[in-house]
Amino acid sequence: MGEIIVKEVLTRKDLRDFIYLPEKVHKNEPDWLPPIYMDEWELYDKKKNKSFGYADAILLIAYRDSKPVGRIMGIINRRYNEINDENHGRFCFMECYNDPDVFHALISRIEQWARQNGMSKLVGPLGFSDKDPQGFQIEGFQYPLFITAANNSPYMVELIENEGYTKKVDLVNYLGEIPRKFPDVYERVLDKITRTNEFEFIEFTGKKQLRPFIIPILELMNDTFAEIYGFVPLNDKEKKEFAARYLPILDPKFIKTVRKDGELIGFAIGMPDLSAGIKACRGRVLPFGIFSILRESKRSKKLMMMLGGVRKDFRGKGIDVMMGVKI
């Protein structure tokens, strides 16, 4: 086999190799879920992704015999490190064939890069924030994949452990059936909260009604997500950009909020699982893939809970039960 050459992504061709490598690695895996490539191009664009404003990053791609065989991204999130008194670099969006030599070549280059930039340790997979897919999937490979979670082959776990890495934190996805009848305890909690009239429960019928709530939801997210590993709070500019980007694709009927004395104290955001539509168009939204995704949004029987939180001083009062039952 030829020599492994690791190079930094500097040109548009390099970036194309980087972005589309995973579909080559997973081409024989029928259950693999591609990303939405339109989003991928924006994710790695320093002009469009504002995270580059507070983070240093490097993209590397490994070639063997002039063919791309592996990729990795390194990130130093200065904002996170400052807030949490950390001194770590991150690796993320790593893909390669089942080849220990390629894996080692990539991870060792990121380790070197992190050390050269004053970092004392490396953690990952962890992107710019917790809102990027993070971690390696280590079990549950028999279940369908979905777009917001880790999407890796089982061998990646062995490859990273062989490099001396150990678990930092468990990240858990839950899959559950929606019961036709909720447990009696849920009904009692919901009845009690409703009778007290202490909280104002708000549902939405349209995006015009939802729009004024988006920024308050993101402000509450900053507060309630502070204890989540890897979370980076959004600044005012990012809140506006986040709202502008996601409001068009949110379905108001799957968003629930709770207020106390006019102040937002809880929120839950769900959206239909679009995985089948994304697979059908192979992650290519334009020009016609959007129709597969829109069609799936209407017929999907799975709901993904994307975000949710309750203000700390109101936890344990059944507000999460109220929103869960209603959604």
Regions from the PLM with identified roles:
Residues 120-127, 168-175, 257:
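A structural signal for short, well-ordered beta-strand segments and their strand-loop junctions
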Residues 128-130, 179-181, 207, 273-275:
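Short, solvent-exposed loop/turn segments at secondary-structure junctions
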Residues 22-59, 63-64, 72-82, 204, ...:
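A conserved beta-strand-loop-helix scaffold within acyl/acetyltransferase catalytic domains
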Residues 2-4, 150-229:
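Acyltransferase donor/substrate-recognition loop-hinge adjacent to the catalytic core
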Residues 1-31:
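Generic start-of-chain signal for non-secretory N-termini
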